[in-house]
């Protein structure tokens, strides 16, 4: 029996998809899968830190063979709690494979197996696309207390700017609540950016609405890139250019990592990354002819 501990299951589409793929793989290999505290893929949007810690002990009592764990984000005490839960499982002899994010801040690495998108490369790829379109004032937008994956995307964006010999605009990383009018007003007032890279598609969709309410046309006046390629990315107007999360490949890689860990518990911890893919839609427009040479 395996267990899946994903606090964002009820709120994040990618973890529903990854969890479903892991469940299918478990059945093929004659394992059952416990989703949180249930044997069914039932979202638990109220999975508090305390409840999650209780579930860890529940998994230990049930003698699960391993736990797939997507660490918490968006809570102030997430780092300590994530590390505590992972260590509790390991001390009980339960293998842990982390999904999507680490239990430590970027760029540090824990000594747990981790399977994720190459978020640094994703941030680079999204930014490079905008630079090829002629954008030069590019901002990054994220929610407070986001996962370490967001910091990796920011680092990738910074590297793209450096490679193109573009000095980042002051305050180019904007962390705030898209429901905060003061925060969103700062995003749309002069001198405003000519493009945004968003930490995820949800933030990008909210930003599209903010820009449209401010009378700004996307992509004619400002371009937007999201991250994840969730279903609604094609439903917003204009449809989002985004970095795709390859959920099936992430699930398959994580499941193989768990089987490897069970076969040889002495293996060194691994961070296995999946190459990102840019999905180009209307929120950025098409590629424009390049007028400037690229920096080396």
Range-by-range predicted roles:
Residues 47-48:
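Leucine-rich repeat
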Residues 5-17:
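Extracytoplasmic "Venus flytrap"
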Residues 2-4, 18-42, 54-68, 73-296:
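Bacterial carbohydrate/catabolite-sensing allosteric modules
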């Amino acid at each position: 029996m395996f267990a899946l501990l994903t606090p964002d299951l009820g709120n994040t589409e990618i973890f529903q998809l990854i969890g479903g793929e892991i469940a299918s793989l478990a059945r093929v290999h004659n394992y059952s899968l416990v989703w949180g505290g249930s044997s069914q893929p039932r979202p638990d949007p109220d999975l508090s830190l305390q409840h999650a810690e209780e579930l860890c002990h529940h998994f230990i009592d049930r003698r699960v063979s391993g736990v797939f764990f997507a660490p918490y984000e968006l809570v102030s005490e997430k780092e300590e709690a994530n590390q505590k839960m992972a260590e509790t499982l390991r001390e009980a002899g339960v293998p842990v494979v982390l999904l999507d994010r680490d239990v430590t801040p970027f760029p540090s690495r824990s000594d747990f197996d981790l399977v994720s998108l190459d978020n640094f490369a994703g941030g680079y790829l999204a930014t490079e696309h905008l630079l090829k379109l002629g954008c030069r004032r590019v901002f990054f937008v994220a929610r407070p207390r986001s996962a370490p994956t967001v910091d990796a995307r920011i680092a990738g964006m910074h590297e793209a700017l450096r490679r193109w010999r573009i000095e980042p605009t002051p305050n180019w990383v904007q962390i705030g609540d898209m429901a905060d009018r003061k925060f969103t007003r700062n995003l749309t007032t002069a001198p405003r950016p000519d493009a945004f890279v968003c930490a995820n598609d949800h933030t990008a969709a909210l930003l599209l609405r903010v820009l449209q309410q401010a009378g700004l046309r996307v992509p004619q006046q400002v371009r937007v890139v999201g991250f994840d390629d969730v279903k609604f990315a094609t439903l917003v107007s204009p449809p989002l250019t985004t970095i795709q999360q390859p959920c099936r490949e992430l699930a398959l890689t994580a499941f193989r990592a768990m089987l490897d860990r069970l076969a040889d518990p002495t293996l060194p911890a691994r961070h296995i990354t999946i190459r990102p893919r840019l999905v180009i839609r209307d929120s950025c427009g098409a590629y424009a002819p390049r007028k400037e040479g690229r920096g080396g």
